[in-house]
Amino acid sequence: MGQEDQELLIRGGSKHPSAEHLNNGDSGAASQSCINQGFGQAKNYGTLLPPSPPEDSGSGSGQLAENLTYAWHNMDIFGAVNQPGSGWRQLVNRTRGLFCNERHIPAPRKHLLKNVCGVAYPGELLAVMGSSGAGKTTLLNALAFRSPQGIQVSPSGMRLLNGQPVDAKEMQARCAYVQQDDLFIGSLTAREHLIFQAMVRMPRHLTYRQRVARVDQVIQELSLSKCQHTIIGVPGRVKGLSGGERKRLAFASEALTDPPLLICDEPTSGLDSFTAHSVVQVLKKLSQKGKTVILTIHQPSSELFELFDKILLMAEGRVAFLGTPSEAVDFFSYVGAQCPTNYNPADFYVQVLAVVPGREIESRDRIAKICDNFAISKVARDMEQLLATKNLEKPLEQPENGYTYKATWFMQFRAVLWRSWLSVLKEPLLVKVRLIQTTMVAILIGLIFLGQQLTQVGVMNINGAIFLFLTNMTFQNVFATINVFTSELPVFMREARSRLYRCDTYFLGKTIAELPLFLTVPLVFTAIAYPMIGLRAGVLHFFNCLALVTLVANVSTSFGYLISCASSSTSMALSVGPPVIIPFLLFGGFFLNSGSVPVYLKWLSYLSWFRYANEGLLINQWADVEPGEISCTSSNTTCPSSGKVILETLNFSAADLPLDYVGLAILIVSFRVLAYLALRLRARRKE
Amino acid sequence: MQESGGSSGQGGPSLCLEWKQLNYYVPDQEQSNYSFWNECRKKRELRILQDASGHMKTGDLIAILGGSGAGKTTLLAAISQRLRGNLTGDVVLNGMAMERHQMTRISSFLPQFEINVKTFTAYEHLYFMSHFKMHRRTTKAEKRQRVADLLLAVGLRDAAHTRIQQLSGGERKRLSLAEELITDPIFLFCDEPTTGLDSFSAYSVIKTLRHLCTRRRIAKHSLNQVYGEDSFETPSGESSASGSGSKSIEMEVVAESHESLLQTMRELPALGVLSNSPNGTHKKAAICSIHQPTSDIFELFTHIILMDGGRIVYQGRTEQAAKFFTDLGYELPLNCNPADFYLKTLADKEGKENAGAVLRAKYEHETDGLYSGSWLLARSYSGDYLKHVQNFKKIRWIYQVYLLMVRFMTEDLRNIRSGLIAFGFFMITAVTLSLMYSGIGGLTQRTVQDVGGSIFMLSNEMIFTFSYGVTYIFPAALPIIRREVGEGTYSLSAYYVALVLSFVPVAFFKGYVFLSVIYASIYYTRGFLLYLSMGFLMSLSAVAAVGYGVFLSSLFESDKMASECAAPFDLIFLIFGGTYMNVDTVPGLKYLSLFFYSNEALMYKFWIDIDNIDCPVNEDHPCIKTGVEVLQQGSYRNADYTYWLDCFSLVVVAVIFHIVSFGLVRRYIHRSGYY
């Protein structure tokens, strides 16, 4: 049975005839030559001939319809080793280097990919397989020029498109990279998402109609028409597209510009077998149109495996095989590992190439043998020749006019504004929940403080209610902003990194789109609570109050933006927020008399929007309350006699009202500018 | 299905779990914005399981296969009696109907998502659980031995002293398996044991299961390792005979010859140790729901159950499945994983009209009458095993509380980093407050406002820190509680008491530290006694705040919901604390607020013995002359016993919150199944 072969292979045993000549010599050199013979003369496993030219390659929109052959050679990749306590050791090293004039104490590195070669042809679906840790994703990242920080691609490695060496920028124009985790704005529909992508991704000269036509075409191609009006959703929170549909949508956004080369990292992870099949089918369809498709895959099922044109097997950072699946059968049976019947070949190869815990040495030996065998096979030698000869093939066309961003500033702005507006309208957490919450809280406060009279107790309560306005507006808006803004930040980071739009267009579009909401919330709140409590009557007083509350809402929104741009995650922002707000709250003059603020902290109180707003609102409420309007019993010395007295005991003066408006306005502008700078810094640093 | 005859002869009596006509309904949830109309509408019910019948014998390793939504997990939970709700049908063991609590004794359920205490090491975790799961008279040495055996058996010996959070997915899964094996159950239910694991880990998990099921163990250590001495009061000849042998005789019989080669070569190290299990005479039976098994994993199963749309399409030996399919014209292609093929055939709705229905018809025809008539095994077996199970005694309640407290403390200590960060934030707030209020001097009218504000901030900070801290932690712990309480590991009350008790020292520590920073800056003129009494009160309010936090999170059951819906509650409590408004404006409501008690007591302590406050120069301005007037102005009580009354009230409020939330947690646990 086939299992026996496998067993023998894993054991490294020598009972099987076909495995014999691999193991016969305990002296390595003899076996090497033996294998060399076997491969060089008798058998040619793996072909490097490109497949027959695709039939209907011109069916796209006519732009960039070139076919690309992507070859890579001698790729050596090193990664930083994460040692326990290495941070401290590095520091010690660095200081020692500083003092002892030893500048270069190299950090330990790990050899992730060892001399990896390969080639992908147009019209071909190439699957990179291997057990976890074999270096699939590392290779893919390197091929897409998107290696994360700390990974070094050695300069000896070559990456050639149609025989021409490429750099990151040229690659970006031609290659679409679909990452394993897809990020979307959950409240949009699939179609809206694609239209946005079309606005910012496609070349400048196209009209809106052409873009929409392309979107329709892509929707058809990737069979998304059924779900194009479904909202994308957030996994686990908002029901929306299914996993397979999300994946196809991610392909669709990349396919809009019709790139000739498509690289996908684990497109099927997390999908059940049928969805996975449909996703790979879509990729297959794309490849049949003349595109070059490379994907990594962990455990393909049997049917999935049949769809691949070529497979690239990796083990321990080396290439174990590259060629068609049928060649793989030959190759592996040649090295002594015959795939049993009724056994998924993919499972089998991955298993043969896996490092079994507890038997590391054996497994490594086995893998090394297979890789050596492949390295001296015909394929590898063909590859050398190919690299030597193909250099003169047709040169690459220059990418379109060389703009960093595909869309103009104004188009980017319009697109971002449009998308943000849609997401504001559709995000229930923003609009529906916020308005309901505001209404409820306003009614609640109104009921508790219902109909205050101007008595000694009433004065206390009114002052409390006014301060409650401020705390409520602040905390509600800060947290709402943090929650919504930080949840969208990953999408921004990825899109900014792909150069879809500029940082400033995003920030401007986003904040302008959210503005109407932050005008409505204070309006609703004030309109309900103000009359219920029975604050100072009069239209002017009401609008004064409304203006101040609206300003406070916007200051706190700006502050929320600042915090979310400056902190690394949602939970970080949420836990940093309150401790930072508390000093401002105390300077408001309610919990701490503004006369008692220590001198050395006075400057800080000019940053407190609570102070400006509290002063403004109290002036609005008390400035024109005449002596006698407050009903005090004559004997009571603790009762304030007039509005003026109240303001004086709180150390506020009625003349400062204009200053308060100005202070709030300045705070809004400066917080936003700071937030923008923080966002920009962050987008830069991540690159 | 038919091999039972051979095996029962050698390895002790065979146990057979049988289930008949299992049906499970859930209310059909239609999407509508108006929940009221949903209530009024006649409830439709969705049938998730339809007449599922079948059986498993010791020695079987069964895979439940099916597409997403086929009802795999539901079937598993239904057989193991872990399902709450509308379940009909019978589950019997050798002809004896099994109740829920009996099932939890003889079986284990390995959930899909591993829920462990992440900061323990593998060894600690198992040793800890062995206290709960083994008989109360088991000695420490025996527990240690058992844990060491289990670690060896699941191949975790090298990782025994690694924290769980640093283990890989496969290692965690195997650890969960080891945890389930502490009680040495006969029946193992595993929900998707391979999901999320790489191929080798997945293989080793199933391999371990296979070993547990198909190896035969002739003799073993004495039974009292798990079941304690007193379960042998009625010794039946067999068990005492095997128990008397001080050295166990281990013998493994390779069950079927054809698997020998593949198995010996891929043998996991030291699986043999599992033969040391107390119920050694019994082989085990395991049943797994599994999603897309790879070829090598699929070959390990002795039986498969194919499901489609809540019905069993096929159940039987793995080898016979291919024939079953071939008979109907579904030919298994070469080089294709049979599992993939079966699933694809079932899902292929476009080809011939519904393969699933055709297959099911054939299956039902073949097994006609097998499950509809009498039980497969008549009521003959009442062996020692069940007797031991019934004699099982858990550890005492108070010991459970103690162990759980140790667990909480250890967890907190291991998480010292995040604890320190939280504490750092807390201290930053304290320092900020003390800086801001450092300008207070003398006793003037301003001081009245400032001290009121500072006291409000003190109680505010204590209460919110603790209630929110709990709201973030507690919902994450709910699944663990539900599972462990549901499995009968410990009682809910023990858990709850331990939880509350573990918070008390933290509350006192933080309360006094927080206060001392501020006290040093603001109230330092007032002496040490005031410090002690204020700190005591703040700590008490922190304890009450824990109750409030647990109440909120058990009311809403998720931290997101809790923090969103808590806002109105917080607002009301805050307002009636007395700083924003005079507490007597709306009579009576103040007694609901934690803030009121804590504010009142702090204000009382500060102001009660002050009898001279400076008046402003301007005669028009209002002037408060004594501390008592300050209290009167805020409508605070100023009787002699006010402070102690408030302390007492805080304790009462805390107790009420805890009782209510205990009830809520209990309802939550009883309402939903815990698989």
Swiss-Prot record, chain A:
Cytoplasmic side: 1-419, 482-497, 553-568, 666-675
Matching InterPro entries: AAA+_ATPase, ABC2_TM, ABC_transporter-like_ATP-bd, ABC_transporter-like_CS, ABCG_dom, ABCG_transporters, P-loop_NTPase, Pigment_permease/Abcg
Region (Disordered): 1-30
Biological-process GO terms, alphabetical: aminergic neurotransmitter loading into synaptic vesicle; biogenic amine biosynthetic process; cGMP transport; compound eye pigmentation; eye pigment metabolic process; eye pigment precursor transport; gravitaxis; guanine transport
One Pfam family cited in the UniProt record for this chain: ABC_tran
Molecular functions per Gene Ontology: ABC-type 3',5'-cyclic GMP transmembrane transporter activity; ABC-type guanine transporter activity; amine transmembrane transporter activity; ATP binding; ATP hydrolysis activity; ATPase-coupled transmembrane transporter activity; guanine transmembrane transporter activity; L-tryptophan transmembrane transporter activity
Tissue specificity statement from the Swiss-Prot or TrEMBL entry: Expressed in the head (at protein level). Expressed in the eye, specifically in retina primary pigment cells, in the basement membrane of the base of secondary and tertiary pigment cells, and in retinula cells (at protein level). Expressed in the retina underlying lamina in the epithelial glia that surrounds the array of lamina cartridges (at protein level). Weakly expressed in photoreceptors, specifically in terminals of R1-R6, R7 and R8 (at protein level). Expressed at very low levels in medulla and central brain (at protein level). Expressed in principal cells of the Malpighian tubules.
Inducing or repressing factors: Up-regulated during aging in intestinal stem cells.
Keyword Transport: yes
UniProt note: phenotype after gene disruption: Eyes are white due to a defect in color pigment production. Malpighian tubules appear clear or white. Loss of st/scarlet protein in the pigment cells and retinula cells of the compound eye. Transport of cGMP, but not cAMP, is inhibited in Malpighian tubules; however, basal fluid transport rates or rates stimulated by cGMP in the tubules are normal. In Malpighian tubules, uptake of guanine, xanthine and riboflavin is impaired while uptake of hypoxanthine, guanosine and adenine is not affected.
Domain of life assignment: Eukaryota
Record topological domains on the Extracellular side: 441-460, 519-531, 590-644
Catalytic reactions on record: 3',5'-cyclic GMP(in) + ATP + H2O = 3',5'-cyclic GMP(out) + ADP + phosphate + H(+); guanine(out) + ATP + H2O = guanine(in) + ADP + phosphate + H(+); riboflavin(in) + ATP + H2O = riboflavin(out) + ADP + phosphate + H(+); (6S)-5,6,7,8-tetrahydrofolate(out) + ATP + H2O = (6S)-5,6,7,8-tetrahydrofolate(in) + ADP + phosphate + H(+)
Membrane-protein topology: Multi-pass membrane protein
Xref: SMART domains: AAA
Self-association and partners: May form a heterodimer with bw/brown. May form a heterodimer with st/scarlet.
Family (UniProt): Belongs to the ABC transporter superfamily. ABCG family. Eye pigment precursor importer (TC 3.A.1.204) subfamily.
Protein name as it appears in the record: Protein white
Gene: w
From Swiss-Prot, chain B:
TM helices/strands, residue ranges: 420-440, 461-481, 498-518, 532-552, 569-589, 645-665
Family under the similarity heading: Belongs to the ABC transporter superfamily. ABCG family. Eye pigment precursor importer (TC 3.A.1.204) subfamily.
Protein known as: Protein brown
Sequence positions that bind ATP: 66-73
Residue intervals annotated with topology Cytoplasmic: 1-419, 482-497, 553-568, 666-675
Stated induction or repression of this protein's expression: Up-regulated during aging in intestinal stem cells.
Principal location class: membrane
Subunit details: May form a heterodimer with w/white.
Extracellular side of membrane: 441-460, 519-531, 590-644
Entries under PROSITE patterns matching the protein: ABC_TRANSPORTER_1, ABC_TRANSPORTER_2
Start-end of Low complexity biased regions: 236-248
Provenance organism: Drosophila melanogaster
Membrane-protein topology: Multi-pass membrane protein
